[in-house]
Amino acid sequence: MQKEQLSALMDGETLDSELLNELAHNPEMQKTWESYHLIRDSMRGDTPEVLHFDISSRVMAAIEEEPVRQPATLIPEAQPAPHQWQKMPFWQKVRPWAAQLTQMGVAACVSLAVIVGVQHYNGQSETSQQPETPVFNTLPMMGKASPVSLGVPSEATANNGQQQQVQEQRRRINAMLQDYELQRRLHSEQLQFEQAQTQQAAVQVPGIQTLGTQSQ
């Protein structure tokens, strides 16, 4: 209602002393009165080239109304120490699988070494079985004929060389198999010893349960 009265007063359609008195003492009505005059001058093209606006109070009020945003508190994550991994239930569950995978990997390496060694031995055997080309002494143009000589090695020497290669190959294979069996036994004994220590520690300290001692 007051805005309509201010618009009529600005257009000269009405003249009310009470409205003028209220306009003189009401800051909000004064701002509305200024806005109406600015709008009318802008529509008529009577505005000056430079307009002075004081919006600092409104900006300050808007800033004060903005909620205060507090940054979220970052909680540092504590990583378990290496000596604590063995006491974790997950590690106790994964450890037997890791041991089995290690044994399978060692067995695969030994099998691969045996296969490669056999193939290498077969290749050497085929090479040694090929006869060498005999060397003949031809008759010269002038003079006497020289005796014919053959550069073929004896069968006994070839057989001895093959037997030595076979024995060396077998010795290497036996050494690899013995080393694998020794490593497997040492790893199995170490795993059993660590599991026994873990179970003994869980029994001695009350209130601590691991995956191996917890009842299903």
Swiss-Prot record:
Oligomeric form and interacting partners? Interacts 1:1 with ECF RNA polymerase sigma-E (RpoE); this inhibits the interaction of sigma-E with the RNA polymerase catalytic core and leads to a decreased expression of sigma-E-regulated genes. Interacts with RseB with 1:1 stoichiometry. The liberated N-terminus (residues 1-108) forms a complex with SspB and RpoE; binding to SspB is competitively inhibited by ssrA-tags, although the 2 proteins bind in opposite directions in SspB's peptide-binding groove.
Post-translational modification comment from the UniProt entry: Sequentially cleaved by DegS (a site-1 protease) in its periplasmic domain between Val-148 and Ser-149, then by RseP (a site-2 protease) between positions Ala-108 and Cys-109. The N-terminal fragment is then degraded by primarily ClpX-ClpP in an ATP-dependent fashion. Sequential cleavage by DegS, RseP and ClpX-ClpP frees RpoE from RseA.
Q: Give start-end ranges for the coiled-coil region(s).
A: 158-202
Gene disruption phenotype:
About 10-fold increased sigma-E activity. Neither sigma-E nor RseB associate with the inner membrane.
Please give the record's induction comment: Transiently induced by cold shock in a PNPase-dependent fashion. Upon stress induction (OMPs or heat shock) decreases in under 3 minutes (at protein level). Part of the rseD-rpoE-rseA-rseB-rseC operon.
Q: List the disulfide bonds.
A: none
Region named Poly-Gln (Q2): 190-200
A single GO BP term for this record reads: negative regulation of DNA-templated transcription
The protein's name? Anti-sigma-E factor RseA
Q: Periplasmic side of the membrane: what ranges?
A: 119-216
Q: What is known to happen upon mutating S146X? A: No effect on protein cleavage
Ranges for region Disordered: 146-166
Locate the site labelled Cleavage.
Answer: A108, C109, V148, S149
What organism is this sequence from? Escherichia coli (strain K12)
The answer, when asked if Membrane is one of the entry's keywords, is: yes
Family according to the record: Belongs to the RseA family.
Functionally, this protein is described as follows:
An anti-sigma factor for extracytoplasmic function (ECF) sigma factor sigma-E (RpoE). ECF sigma factors are held in an inactive form by an anti-sigma factor until released by regulated intramembrane proteolysis (RIP). RIP occurs when an extracytoplasmic signal triggers a concerted proteolytic cascade to transmit information and elicit cellular responses.
Instruction: Provide the transmembrane region boundaries.
Output: 101-118
Write down any Gene Ontology CC term. Answer: sigma factor antagonist complex
Where is the stretch described as Primary binding site for RseB? 169-186
Cytoplasmic side residue ranges read: 1-100
Q: Provide the protein's localization.
A: Cell inner membrane
Give the UniProt keywords, A-Z. Answer: Cell inner membrane, Cell membrane, Coiled coil, Membrane, Signal-anchor, Transcription, Transcription regulation, Transmembrane, Transmembrane helix
